[in-house]
Amino acid sequence: MNVALTKQELHNLAMNHVGKDLEKRGFEFIAINSKLKKHPQFVCIDKNSQYFFVIVRVVILPENPNNYDVVWMETFKKHALENDAKVLYAGVGLGNPEGEDLPIYLNKEYLIEYNGIQFIETNLN
């Protein structure tokens, strides 16, 4: 029986992909938050002890995972500046290979669109 992934499970799947990418890039995890709509998902530091707030956003394909709410991001950038952190954005698109109207199922193949981490300039607009 096919069991469709919940929004939280889709979010966790996206976070797993991004977390592996962050590890490969040499980031050290300070905090991880996997709750939906709770930001940032990752607080990391690099080898120079610079803090990074990482936002992970999952969308269902064909929606573009690289797009984000610019107005909301301004508020988040302010939060990062107050904490001497830089902002990274990771958009992840997931889809069912058998059709974009079908859900993504547990333990089944899925499509992924992930173009890596985007550095978000923290200068306020």
Regions found by a protein language model. Name each.
Residues 66-85:
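Short, charged, amphipathic alpha-helix that recurs within catalytic cores of restriction-modification
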Residues 33-34, 91:
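Short loop/turn and capping residues at structural boundaries
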Residues 36-40:
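Short acidic/glycine-enriched loop/turn segments that link adjacent beta-strands
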Residues 43-55:
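Active-site beta-strand-loop-beta-strand hairpin of nuclease catalytic cores
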Residues 41-43, 100:
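A short acidic (Asp/Glu
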Residues 86-125:
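Domain-level recognition of nuclease-like catalytic cores that cleave nucleotide substrates
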Residues 1-32:
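Acidic-basic catalytic patches of nuclease active cores, encompassing PD-(D/E)XK
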Residues 54-67:
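Short beta-strand-loop-alpha-helix junction that forms the active-site gateway
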